[in-house]
Amino acid sequence: MEIEKRMVLKPHGSMLAIQNDAIPGNRSTIKDTLVNLKDNLSDIRKKNPLIKSKGGIPLLYDKSEHTVYVDATDSHSLIIGSTGSKKTRLVVLPLIHMLSYAEESMIISDPKAEIYNRTAAMLKQSGYRVTVLNFRNPSLGESWNPLAIPYELYKSGKRDRAYEFINDIAANLMCSELSHQDVFWEYSASDLLFGLILLAFKQSKKEQVSFEDVLNLRADMFQDGNPNICMWEKAKRDILIHHSLIGTIEAPNNTRTSILSTFDQKMRIFAFQENLTDMLKQNTISVDRLGFEKSAVFLIMPDEKTTYHRLISLFVKQCYERLIYLAQNSEQATFRIRINYILDEFSTLPTISDFPAMITAARSRNIRFFLFVQSQKQLEKRYQVEAETIESNCNNWIFLTSRELSLLKSISALAGQTAEGKPLISVFALQHLDKEKGEALVFSGRQFPYITDLVDISEIDHDRYEILEMSKRTKVQEKMFDRDTGVTGVSEEEDIQKEIERKFDELFD
């Protein structure tokens, strides 16, 4: 077969006393390291006891057998392909199908809702619990209040854990895109946000606290840019609130104005769109069951603007922290069902704080990451020196195409050379992988790199699929929490509504 002739396996530098030439790859050797979805899991585990599930990323497609071979280990994967390289058709969509066959959970970032439209109905029919956060059209799908988890922890007395979540929120919203020229303003705004969230928690008697409450506090605390001394005298009794806010409260006027300006600019996203503000005021989404029942969460975002990308990064971080917390408190310290982060356009998302540590620790908790990037430069711009740590934690690399010269040279060097010093695959050849055939260069674990055809989604669903209609987001009535009694009660508006319904029933009973 043509594929067999083009596989490149033996890099320059071998210590073996044989000719150091590129040799054609043996497909059977590669297949032995991967998993055939047609095999039983018990048979698979006889060969590799570490494999707990047979779901994974497709790394080889044998068209003659109509068989897809996947990496079912706990390895993370990096997929590189510029716009129009068929990343979605060749990798994302087939990956979701492979994971669904193995009944694994997924969290999927989805520009344009293209992935949702193609797979959500299939997942629903397969018994998946499908939920959607729709930042493209916030009137559809679920609601998500980023402050819900830390407020719940705060109310239940788990203050230290609540502070960790608040700190993550402040860092992701204020410091995800540092100026790198003078980071003082971002860090000061982060301290301000931390203090205001904590103050909102301390003062509130509502069941939920949202960013709307935080923005109202900011307006009250700094009327006309000047601190409200009366509010400050009460707030500073809490030592943590005091330390968080004092840098802004006691700053010189010009400095305070700049801090507030930075804060307002970063928080503008929570104020200018009514549907989004309402979506973030309440919480109808839960990730707690992801590791215990097969679930899929779609994060739909606009691809034409990056306005809401910080919220996607925040959700990814908060969801991960919540899952780690749940895993640590479980008997096995891991999840029964594997959880897969499928992060399309990962390199365009704002920096996720501590991501290198996240991807390092994830495997032991049965969590995998699949990172889709358009270019290496984008990744380096976001994560700087930590980009290399992220790349090195991905055992699988799939290269589709690129015009980024430094990346092409790097990929060519990784593939190795012949004894004469010629690259096994040149920069020129890397730019001419056959798009229509779905050709890709694959680096997988300690296997020699090889070129293969990837399975197109049309080979799996034959381009026939239903579109699952998204439900309209429903407003949840605000409830009050009495901190003295620990009882949650309904708001006055809900009391009135119930009284009207009772009178109506009396009249027509």
Predicted regions and their residues:
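Pre-P-loop entry segment of helicase/translocase ATPase cores
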Residues: E2-D71
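Short intrinsically disordered, low-complexity coil segments enriched in acidic
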Residues: E2-R6, K437, T452
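Short secondary-structure boundary/capping segments
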Residues: M122-Q125, P146-Y151, V385-T389, A413-T418, ...
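Short acidic, gly/pro-rich beta-turn/loop elements at beta-sheet edges
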Residues: H309, T452, H462
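Conserved ATP-driven motor cores of ASCE-family P-loop NTPases powering translocation/secretion/packaging/pilus
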Residues: I359-G445
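Short, surface-exposed linear segments at secondary-structure transitions and domain or protein termini
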Residues: E459-E469
